[in-house]
């Protein structure tokens, strides 16, 4: 970022002064690294677009990425719901499957409700994202749609993962089942590209402006 604003440059990852540092993560299935730049010089010919005019494009890319991540979160919700329904239908306690207990049914119903609402949010956000890429009439609503989807889907994914872990019980923490992997993914993806609080504040600022 310079006096003219934010600029976007092409940078060879093997350039002098560029280093990548591996970061330990809660979600072991999603690798992350910190990019360190020390005294790195980039020629003006590697500038993408006009100097200081990169933020609109970067903002759009971040919104599109948030929509994509929210879609992944909805997929995680559905998978957790499916696994939980299957497990509770097989797990027997007191000579009956635990799925037959009303409290378990209520918990599963709550999981389904949050999953379906999250699905509705991502369907709309995906539609707006497509319109943005095609220059359609909804292109101007990408920021709002992405924040709605990311905020709700983040909260729903973590809540559904927590409920699933509760219904699986202690076995959900073992490597024999994938529930704990989804729980870790839910928590890590919640904070990636902004958590629910960040996006709700952004949405409120946009709507009240």
Q: Residue locations for each model-derived region?
A:
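A generic local secondary-structure boundary/capping motif
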Residues: 1, 22-27
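Alpha-helical interface subdomain recognition
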Residues: 60-209
């Amino acid at each position: 970022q310079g006096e003219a604003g934010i600029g976007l440059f092409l940078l060879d990852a093997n350039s002098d002064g560029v280093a990548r540092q591996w970061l330990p993560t809660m979600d072991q299935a999603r690798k992350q690294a910190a990019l360190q730049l020390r005294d790195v010089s980039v020629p003006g010919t590697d500038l993408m677009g006009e100097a200081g005019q990169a933020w609109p494009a970067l903002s759009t890319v971040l919104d599109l990425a948030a929509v994509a991540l929210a879609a992944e979160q909805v997929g995680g919700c559905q998978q957790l719901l499916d696994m939980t329904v299957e497990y509770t239908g097989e797990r027997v306690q007191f000579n009956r499957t635990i799925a037959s207990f009303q409290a378990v049914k209520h918990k599963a119903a709550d999981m389904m409700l949050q999953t379906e609402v999250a699905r509705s949010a991502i369907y709309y956000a995906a539609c707006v994202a497509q319109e943005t890429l095609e220059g359609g009439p909804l292109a101007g609503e990408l920021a709002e749609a992405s924040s709605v989807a990311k905020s709700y889907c983040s909260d729903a994914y973590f809540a559904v993962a927590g409920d699933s872990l509760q219904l699986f019980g202690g076995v959900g923490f073992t490597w024999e089942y994938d529930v704990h992997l989804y729980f870790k993914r839910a928590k890590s993806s919640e904070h990636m590209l902004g958590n629910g609080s960040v996006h709700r504040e952004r949405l409120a600022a946009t709507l009240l402006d």
